[in-house]
Amino acid sequence: NMNLKEEIKTLDLHAQIGDLKGVDKENKIVEIFRNVAQQILSGYFLVQKNQSDSCVKVHPTCVEIYYHEEGDRGDKIKDYIVYHRNNDDGKMDKSLFPLGILHNHVSGIDMTFEKGDNPQDAIRMSALIREFRMDDSKKLEDNYCMDYLELKRNRRGNIVTKPTYLYDALYSQFSVFDGFSIQWVDGENLVELEEESEVRVNVPQFKRDERNMVVKVLASEGDGDATANKMYRQCLRKWNFKVK
């Protein structure tokens, strides 16, 4: 039986990677993250009005996995684009999110899967919901036209491709005077994903500069693809997964 929470709790990336190196290691990580993404893309957020049968289901259809390990031992996996992590200068450590906290930020909403005993050895793992579809067939009350969402939905076969619109899909369905809840529900069946995963949108490569600070690699430096906004070198990790 599928259960995203258990999958995350038992996930041990390094145990599965073992002695793999280079491309083999990268491919193994993609395979592991694909399983997590498939669990997420098979489930949905249930937004339910209090004391009512009125509800909306919000199904993620595209997610990006983010994974950053704190600390400086050699084999740590670094993903410096992660928002919720300790400062590089060591001046501010961020406490751990309990499993399943929704983290709202300028790019959208992350479902967070953090682990560890303290901020210094934390694993900062999350999934950014990049695209989603809304099933409001059971929304019996509080209906109103979510204009911008409707426009987006109709353009892409019911799929909303703007990640920040998830705020509205989750938080603007029902009145706070009645109250509502948001709960994750695992899918009954696994959905099929696109064969190939993709790179994450506008995620740059990082390097350490001469002062040993972590900085983004500019598009003008070296060869390779630039990010969609043309400012930086694109990070090549294919951690973006989509429903077929």
Language-model regions, residue ranges each:
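A cross-family signal for N-terminal binding/gating loops and helix N-caps
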Residues: 2-244
